[in-house]
């Protein structure tokens, strides 16, 4: 008898499959399409461990199943090879990532080929290939054209170990998602994608998506939509004088573009004074804030620079003189003495609140330490304390700052604001529990109706004013009431219910010009630039004349240059900044000298569109053909176990943009998402090289178990959505199952097939198994499908004691077909042994006939006082008395039934209910 030898069978079939391009997908085929893939791996190390292979086992099993069902299946593969993981591995090994990445890809590919993954390798992609990232850069330029890619100065998360900024999604519990280092905030000019512009769309689509609830909840919470009002609290300043401006100049002041003014007549202003800023529009004059005078000087008009920063520029003195004569008359000359005032704009403090109905109870304001007014509002008495507090606060992680179990800290700025609702003065504080990156970076303190505000007010002895009446039936012992109710101490709104008051107060704020209805999002725009080498260069040049200019398509890709030293500098700049020959270029717009952007794109940029590139991977004229992408995509099933709010949000955002650009007919990239659990090490911990508990899949294969046993075992461990642990005994058990199946076919093949067997019984077992396995694979309940196959093999072994007959061939052929998605190598070999030349992969999946399934037993649930205490397997047709007797004699039931029961009720074929 030929023994089961995976080391002989598996390489043989892998070679056959490779030679005839068995799994090559056909564009626009006659069969219905089915596009399935997993999250492509980043080849950052020496290879994948057994835990990584769960994803590929799931995908390959479904792909093979769908082919057998008659689908034109697309199962592609690619490599997420740009980014920190690959670069850090290269640094660790002392080689360039341009060398390590191809080496790692070759190893990863070998692993996938050795487990028999039915991948269409003709569609293989690699994100660090210029042919790929050319189109990543092209997509960037399209986003830039639509205002969805922009650069700004802001405080950003900085990883001191990886020496780069991180997106909000890449900071977990105050630590870097890659290296677990504590991150800090650092002021930097960075590139962003405006994902917030699509927040409502991304939120609106979630309910209808066939994605796991936990992922949809995570994305909903991450987007964090809040509806309320934005309220402007004017600073209570004592101005020494006023400065009037046109509406156009007022807008420039608010935007920070205008920071000085030149007046013919001197104002009553000196350095350190405050000026009230007035906007004059015709006969209307109204205040729009204040400004702190930082410098005041008098000098002849001719001495005023024509290109003074923060002021309108002039071509020459003549244009400057003409401008001043327009305002002040022809008596003005270049020798006329003018007053020049430099100032810092002090805008109103804008606060977002979801509870505008509580504004009359706001008794103080709190600014985040990062708020631009935090230091400016401090006066001589408080400056030192405010500066010291801010310097310490910004060193803390957000987790520490928002920990409600810690005592609140803060510092009074010395400044006051005016509550627009009641005109009351409100002290302005700085406190670290308010975060600069969320909302406006300022909150109104309503201590009577917010626990956090109450704790702060209690510590610093700030007033508490109740404006929502506590309901009479509220018996809670909490010192502040944060529910809804009837307004009190709220002026004209007294007696109004909260839900009505919110709408009325917002309308009143809008009428008064001090607020408006506002929807905000917790989600911030996607920080895309990285100060690292190994990434797609950002296709922007900076021109002193034209500013930031996108590189035109005909100059793409902007190639990543070869560098000798790619270790991050740590100074906030990429190593590309030192590549002067590469960085110096010409402006595509004016042809003048310009500098390339030296930051690279986060690896998530390349992984946000690869699912669409798979549909047309060799197209060198565009990112994909519209016919191909609209035939294959959206992805029918996408499998992974990571990136709930990063990649899975970004890929949705980009696809929505592609729809708006007319590049796709759909907005959502994935129809069904399967989010699997982890396979942990035998010790119950996550597999990790540092812990020394990694299981190498090739070691498992080479130990003699083979790839089929590895694949089948990983799917047999338990429900794929839950975590499980590797088991050496478990894989040995799965190998024994496959060996028994193999042996069963060999015994049949060598028998004389002359026995008389119970064909009805054989048919019943076969059709029951077809039904069970088919249903379980559809439901992705692979562990129960494999268990059913194991049980079926056991049943066949019992039946074969009667001997083999010709009818066994059909039963064994069906068994081989059913096991094929899990153990394809062995199935292909057995199919050949059973006399078939056809390719098993494309043989029609077997159908079941309910009429042939004999129900030899039935399950009876036994309840005691309504609680399930046992489940009995009884013969079909057993009498009621017999079933009652079995129920009362069951050990699990006897523990709960003492003496004679009051009633024993039998529901035919389903239930025994015992009442005691």
Model-derived regions, located:
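N-terminal catalytic cores of NTP/NDP-binding nucleotidyl/phosphoryl-transfer enzymes
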Residues: 26-95, 101, 124-139, 354, ...
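Long, charged, mostly alpha-helical binding arms that flank functional sites
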Residues: 4, 228-230, 469, 480-507, ...
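Helix-rich, typically C-terminal accessory recognition domains appended to large enzymatic cores
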Residues: 80, 146, 150-157, 234, ...
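Catalytic alpha/beta core of large soluble enzyme barrels
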Residues: 59, 72, 371-476
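Structured alpha/beta reader/binder surfaces that contact nucleic acids or chromatin modification marks
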Residues: 239-346
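Basic, alpha-helical terminal appendages of large translation-related enzymes
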Residues: 1-33, 254, 288, 331-342, ...
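Residue patterns forming the tRNA-binding/recognition surfaces of aminoacyl-tRNA synthetases
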Residues: 3, 12, 16-20, 92-238, ...
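Amphipathic alpha-helical
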Residues: 201-226, 368-411, 556-586, 812-844
């Amino acid at each position: 008898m030929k023994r089961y030898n995976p080391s002989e069978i598996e390489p043989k079939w892998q070679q056959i499959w490779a030679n005839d391009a068995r799994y090559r997908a056909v564009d626009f085929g006659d069969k219905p399409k089915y596009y399935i893939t997993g999250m492509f791996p980043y080849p950052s190390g020496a290879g994948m461990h057994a835990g990584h292979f769960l994803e590929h086992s799931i995908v390959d099993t479904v792909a093979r199943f769908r082919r057998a069902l008659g689908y034109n299946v697309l199962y592609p593969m690619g490599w997420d090879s740009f980014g920190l993981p690959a670069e850090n591995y290269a640094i660790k090994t002392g080689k360039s990532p341009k060398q390590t990445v191809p080496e790692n890809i070759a190893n990863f590919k070998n692993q996938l080929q050795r487990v028999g993954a039915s991948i269409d390798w003709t569609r293989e992609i690699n994100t660090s290939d210029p042919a790929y990232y050319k189109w990543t850069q092209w997509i960037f330029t399209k986003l830039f054209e639509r205002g969805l890619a922009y650069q700004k100065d802001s405080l950003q998360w900085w990883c001191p170990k990886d020496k780069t900024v991180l997106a909000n999604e890449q900071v977990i519990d105050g630590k870097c998602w890659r290296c677990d280092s504590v991150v800090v905030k650092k002021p930097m000019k960075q590139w962003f994608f405006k994902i917030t512009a699509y927040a409502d769309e991304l939120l609106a689509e979630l309910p209808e998506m066939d994605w796991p609830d936990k992922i949809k909840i995570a994305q909903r919470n991450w987007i964090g939509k809040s509806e309320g009002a934005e309220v402007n609290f004017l600073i209570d300043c004592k101005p020494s004088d006023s400065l009037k401006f046109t509406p156009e100049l007022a807008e420039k002041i608010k935007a920070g573009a205008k920071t000085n003014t030149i007046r013919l007549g001197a104002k009553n202003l000196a350095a350190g004074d405050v000026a009230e800023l007035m906007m004059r529009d015709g006969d209307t004059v109204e205040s729009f804030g204040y400004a702190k005078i930082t410098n005041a000087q008098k000098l002849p008009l001719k001495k005023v620079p024509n290109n003074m920063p923060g002021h309108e520029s002039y071509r020459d003195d003549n244009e400057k003189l003409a401008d001043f004569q327009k305002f002040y008359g022809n008596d003005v000359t270049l020798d006329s003495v003018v007053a020049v005032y430099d100032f810092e704009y002090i805008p109103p403090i804008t606060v977002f609140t979801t509870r505008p109905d509580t504004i009359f109870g706001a008794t103080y304001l709190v600014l985040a330490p990062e708020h631009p007014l935090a230091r400016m509002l401090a006066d001589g008495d408080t400056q030192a304390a405010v500066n010291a507090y801010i310097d310490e606060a910004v060193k803390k992680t957000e987790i520490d700052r928002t920990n409600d179990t810690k005592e609140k800290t803060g510092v009074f700025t010395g400044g006051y604001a005016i509550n627009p609702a009641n005109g009351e003065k409100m002290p302005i504080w700085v406190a670290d529990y308010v975060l600069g990156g969320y909302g406006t970076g300022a909150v109104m303190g309503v201590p009577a109706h917010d626990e956090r505000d109450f704790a702060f007010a209690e510590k610093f002895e700030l007033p508490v004013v109740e404006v929502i009446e506590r309901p009479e039936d509220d018996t809670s012992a909490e010192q502040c009431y944060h529910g809804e109710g009837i307004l009190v101490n709220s002026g004209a709104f007294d007696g109004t219910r909260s839900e009505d008051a919110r709408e009325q107060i917002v309308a009143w704020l809008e009428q008064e010009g001090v607020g408006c209805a506002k929807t905000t999002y917790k989600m911030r725009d996607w920080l895309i630039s990285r100060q690292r080498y190994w990434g797609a260069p950002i296709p922007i040049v900076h021109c002193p004349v034209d500013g930031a200019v996108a590189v035109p398509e005909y100059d793409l890709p902007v190639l990543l240059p070869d560098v000798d030293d790619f270790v991050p500098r740590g100074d906030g700049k990429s190593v590309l900044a030192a590549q002067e020959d590469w960085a110096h270029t010409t402006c595509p717009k004016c042809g003048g000298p310009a500098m390339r952007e030296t930051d690279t794109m986060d690896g998530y940029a390349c992984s946000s569109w690869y699912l669409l590139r798979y549909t047309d991977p060799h197209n060198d004229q565009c990112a994909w053909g519209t016919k191909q992408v609209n035939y294959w995509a959206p992805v029918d099933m996408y499998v992974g176990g990571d990136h709930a709010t990063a990649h899975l949000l970004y890929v949705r955002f980009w696809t929505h943009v592609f729809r708006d650009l007319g590049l796709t007919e759909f907005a959502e990239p994935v129809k069904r998402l399967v989010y699997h659990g982890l396979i942990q090490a035998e010790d119950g911990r996550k597999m990790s090289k540092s812990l020394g508990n990694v299981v190498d899949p090739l070691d498992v294969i080479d130990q003699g178990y083979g790839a089929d046993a590895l694949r089948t075992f990983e799917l047999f461990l338990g429900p794929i959505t839950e975590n499980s642990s590797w088991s050496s005994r478990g894989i040995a058990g799965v190998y024994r199952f496959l060996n028994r199946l193999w042996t069963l076919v060999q015994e049949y093949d060598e028998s004389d097939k002359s026995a008389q067997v119970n064909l009805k019984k054989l048919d019943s077992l076969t059709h029951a198994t077809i039904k069970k396995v088919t249903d379980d694979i559809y439901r992705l309940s692979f562990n129960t499908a494999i268990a059913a196959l194991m049980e079926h093999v056991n049943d066949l072994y019992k039946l074969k004691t009667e001997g083999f007959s010709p009818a066994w061939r059909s039963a064994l052929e069906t068994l081989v077909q059913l096991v094929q998605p899990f153990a394809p190598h062995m199935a292909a070999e057995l199919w050949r042994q059973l006399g078939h030349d056809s390719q098993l992969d494309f043989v029609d999946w077997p159908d079941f006939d309910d009429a042939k399934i004999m129900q030899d037993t039935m399950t009876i649930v036994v309840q005691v006082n309504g609680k399930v205490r046992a489940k009995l397997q009884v013969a079909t047709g057993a009498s009621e008395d017999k079933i009652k007797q079995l129920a009362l004699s069951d050990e699990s039931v006897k523990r709960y039934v003492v003496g004679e029961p009051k009633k024993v009720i039998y529901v035919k074929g389903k239930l025994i209910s015992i009442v005691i």
